[in-house]
């Protein structure tokens, strides 16, 4: 197994976000809820890819993408795409934009 990226998602709760591969070369996302024993594991092949999330954000007004973080919001896995001062929340399972939030 190997970890390709690590991030921290701060939504209603904080999650440590890891993207990587298993020994069988299956790509997975792992979310660990801070201060809890809750761990969520997702097969990346079963939802929106990081690249698709960027494209969905751009279709909805994002310019240059600063950062993309896998996270968990309102009981569902999401991609948070940061562009400038705006955050685009893309549903991992439904492959669509859930919300756009600006600072």
Where are the regions that the model predicts?
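Short extracytoplasmic/periplasmic juxtamembrane "stem" segments immediately C-terminal to an N-terminal membrane anchor
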Residues: 1-3
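Conserved histidines in hydrophobic membrane contexts and catalytic metal-binding motifs
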Residues: 9-39, 51-103
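Second-shell loop/turn segments in exported
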Residues: 40-44
């Amino acid at each position: 197994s190997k970890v390709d990226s690590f991030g921290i998602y701060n939504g209603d709760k904080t999650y440590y976000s890891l993207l990587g591969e298993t020994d069988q070369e299956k790509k997975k996302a792992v979310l660990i809820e801070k201060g809890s024993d809750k761990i969520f594991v997702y097969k990346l092949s079963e939802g929106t890819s990081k690249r698709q999330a960027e494209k969905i954000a751009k279709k909805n007004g994002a310019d240059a993408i600063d950062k993309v973080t896998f996270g968990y919001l309102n009981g569902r896995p999401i991609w948070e795409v940061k562009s400038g001062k705006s955050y685009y929340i893309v549903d991992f399972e439904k492959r669509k934009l859930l919300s756009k939030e600006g600072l």
